[in-house]
Amino acid sequence: MRKLANGDQELQELTREAHSIRAEINRIYYDSPVEAQRLFEELVPGAGVGIDFRPPINIDYGMRLSIGDRTFINADLLIIGGGFVTIGDNVWLGGSVTITPGVIIGDNSIIGAGSVVTKDIPTNTIAVGNPCRPIKPIPEG
């Protein structure tokens, strides 16, 4: 995938398209959840199966986002910037979480409400805060 620069016509079009889709998801979610889920999968082609989310969601570049299976996204998620973001399988994102470009959140992790994730979070970890930091491992099993 080539790097897109600010002012790039392709970047502007991708941004407009993503904003349009996310606005529609946020508008119809409670009246048409199946259609909202379909639009989410269009917005985020790298979305796994069994993802559960609550609006509003704010995702700038869904094509630069990978979300693993069985992930829960609480209300008011913000993923900003054009860097690739990876969210593992079975992750729980609390309400009002912000994720910055380039972050990887490991499988089976929990990100507390209001956290601002600026660095990678290991697998099987509870992490909270601004900036978000690991506070406790989650035992496997």
Predicted regions and their residues:
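Terminal amphipathic alpha-helical/low-complexity segments used for targeting or macromolecular assembly
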Residues: 1-50, 132-136, 140-141
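Short N-terminal micro-motifs specific to bacterial/archaeal maturation
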Residues: 2, 9, 27, 63, ...
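Alpha-helix boundary/capping detector
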Residues: 44, 66, 113, 117, ...
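Left-handed beta-helix
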Residues: 49, 54-55, 60-61, 68-69, ...
